[in-house]
Amino acid sequence: MSEMASMDPEGIDGVRMTWNVWPRTKVEASKCVIPVAACISPIRYHRDIPSVEYAPLRCRICTAALNPFARVDFLAKIWICPICFQRNHFPPHYHVMSETNVPCELYPQYTTVEYTLPNPSQPTGVGNFDQTGAVSGQPSPSVFVFVLDTCMIEEEFGYAKSALKQAIGLLPENALVGFVSFGTQAHVHELGFSDLTKVYVFRGDKEISKDQVLEQLGLGASGRRNPVGGFPMGRDNSANFGYSGVNRFLLPASDCEFTIDLLLEELQTDQWPVQAGRRQSRCTGVAISVATGLLGACFPGTGARIVALIGGPCSEGPGTIVSKDLSEPLRSHKDLDKDAAPFYKKAEKFYDALANQLVNQGHVLDLFASALDQVGVAEMKAAVERTGGLVVLSESFGHSVFKDSFKRVFEDGEESLGLCFNGTLEICCSKDIKIQGIIGPCASLQKKGPSVADTVIGEGNTTQWKMCGLDKRTCLTVFFDLSSSDQSSAPGGVNNQLYLQFMTSYQNSKGKTLQRVTTVTRQWVDTGLSTEELVQGFDQETAAVVVARLASLKMETEEGFDATRWLDRNLIRLCSKFGDYRKDDPASFTLNPNFSLFPQFTFNLRRSQFVQVFNNSPDETAYNRMLLNRENISNAAVMIQPSLTTYSFNSLPQPALLDVASIGADRILLLDSYISVVVFHGMTIAQWRNLGYQNQPEHQAFAQLLEAPQEDAQMIIRDRFPVPRLVVCDQHGSQARFLLAKLNPSATYNNASEMNAGSDIIFTDDVSLQVFFQHLQKLAVQS
């Protein structure tokens, strides 16, 4: 059982916590240094989760769903809610229940249950489900509006169009498809008008309101209108305006696949003339704004995605990130720090407003940015992250990172991402537990209540969140606070257990409305008497990820925040609190095994791209943070502290220390840092390979040695989204930097004489892990 738990630490519930036993008071919790937080995967697949064809039974006071921790009086047909202790009567259809015949949501092993909710006959607004009516109407189809940048060179444009054709071919037949292209202007293509190509043109140089979008598309309150001058009139044009917007602009994939193929064949790169020394006019903001308005008119409150393929920076209209003058560089982190990025705040404000509109409509923005330059991911971050959108950053639309990732989005079967739509998360918790907020792909619905904390972290001030887009890998970090009242009398005095319930309603890819209910319990402990139970309940991997997410948020939102200093202080406080030592004797310092890996995580976090942002562009930093905030604990931990595997003739593949000492001339190393996978050949291995030894029959063992890391790398790549970049390099080669940058610099130019033969050194002044530990021990034991 323990072996199973270690293989799948999230279990059936998909929940991991920093502390698996909780201190009773706010003061004691603050002494624990690491925040009390839970990382939840709301719709993670697990084969043991039962599915039932009815809606959950809810407590009439706190609205928590019936669960295995409820106390049930089978004779009186009453259940007592474990969260608020309210007595609730079972409805008549539960009256056949007895001690030997209980509904599945009361089985002790089913702490997570998935319910099927009735589909509303028509959308009634964001997150409104008619849970009392019978199932009515067909399941809602998935809706996709593709937004394509035309300001690219022909080769890139060809790759992007080819990917779009493939994606539309992979969509379910009933999925609805719309198409917007943009360059200097934004073009909405009327796919329902098959006689000839018909587009609605929007100026790219000025902001356009939702009402203006609807009016120009003929979807506004005034309804029908004559076409704008210059647009072609078809012979059935008068009848065409009798169609709804859905029939005109959004068609089933099976009906419009041929039309879009023809359209893409004819579509050219942006033909607007560009003067020498000037950037192309690219109106990204207007195009996404128009797509948002179109979906808002046709499908408010129903799951839909805007899939944007962008090949460069916005230089026209709202959302502009750089001027058209090529001599002006794109903003850097230094510019943002000095407030020297003239377009940044205005563009960020524009996308914040767009994020609010998308959240209110229940729609998702997915961003596929492929360019050697920045495209504005940093400014768009709110619109992508708050709607639960996917983001992929690559160098080219022809690169495998984009092509394979884009294909994965639309694939079905085991390899699919399990994309779902229009989700709402609700959290109920025991008295004296307060919710500070969530870091991750969601948006606060501002639903106040007694469980809302005064302090806010991330998306807070609520007990309900909108998740316009979510998938089976989506992970959220929920931060909790304890009420400042003394809990000696309550809740622990009455009940030593605390309860948390996570309820996620969502629309799956087939259009069915489901609700997953997860109820977990943990124990209160009095840490004033002993910290032993607290220590045993510490999850250091989860704690490292939570601290990384919190540090990233603080770097974004707090001016002048020094992440390295904050991480160091927290680590010293944690080691002082939970380490075993004699005061002022560093040699006596030891850490419990439950804490022993945490300093190493912190060391690697300090050196990672999440903290050392000045080596990256603002777009890369925003991309890295969005991935960190949405991935599960195991994947996020690999982003912070990559895994290293060594391959040699003498032994089977085995984990290696993330240290420069692991490099050997006769070894191959495989580094997994999540967004890149590096296969690194030692000097001797590379020489033998270049001489072609692997092609000789007597050297089959060498051929197998070369193949093994490549096969393992492909296994990692197949299981991951976005698809990581594969780097194959040799010792002392130019691309060896991808490995060296992640290794502990135990051997540098300062102590090169101590290194082993065939090993390597790192040219850096960074401290090594060993020196870091020495300083930590010294500071942790100080009086």
UniProtKB/Swiss-Prot annotation:
Residues annotated as binding Zn(2+): 59, 62, 81, 84
Subcellular location: Cytoplasmic vesicle, COPII-coated vesicle membrane; Endoplasmic reticulum membrane; Membrane
Coiled-coil boundaries: none
Keywords of this entry: Cytoplasmic vesicle, Endoplasmic reticulum, ER-Golgi transport, Membrane, Metal-binding, Protein transport, Transport, Zinc
Pfam families, alphabetized: Gelsolin, Sec23_BS, Sec23_helical, Sec23_trunk, zf-Sec23_Sec24
Record membrane topology: Peripheral membrane protein
GO molecular function, one term: zinc ion binding
Chain spans, region Zinc finger-like: 59-84
Gene Ontology cellular-component terms listed: COPII vesicle coat; endoplasmic reticulum membrane; extracellular region
GO BP of this protein: COPII-coated vesicle budding; intracellular protein transport
Gene3D superfamilies linked: beta-sandwich domain of Sec23/24 (2.60.40.1670), Sec23/Sec24 helical domain (1.20.120.730), Severin (3.40.20.10), von Willebrand factor, type A domain (3.40.50.410), Zn-finger domain of Sec23/24 (2.30.30.380)
Entries under InterPro entries matching the protein: ADF-H/Gelsolin-like_dom_sf, Gelsolin-like_dom, Gelsolin-like_dom_sf, Sec23, Sec23/24_helical_dom, Sec23/24_helical_dom_sf, Sec23/24_trunk_dom, Sec23_24_beta_S
Domain of life of the organism encoding this protein: Eukaryota
Function: Component of the coat protein complex II (COPII) which promotes the formation of transport vesicles from the endoplasmic reticulum (ER). The coat has two main functions, the physical deformation of the endoplasmic reticulum membrane into vesicles and the selection of cargo molecules.
Subunit-level organization: Component of the coat protein complex II (COPII), composed of at least five proteins: the Sec23/24 complex, the Sec13/31 complex and Sar1. Interacts with SEC24A.
Family: Belongs to the SEC23/SEC24 family. SEC23 subfamily.
Alphabetized PANTHER family for the sequence: PROTEIN TRANSPORT PROTEIN SEC23, PROTEIN TRANSPORT PROTEIN SEC23 B
The protein's name: Protein transport protein SEC23 B
Lineage, broadest ranks: Eukaryota, Viridiplantae, Streptophyta, Embryophyta, Tracheophyta
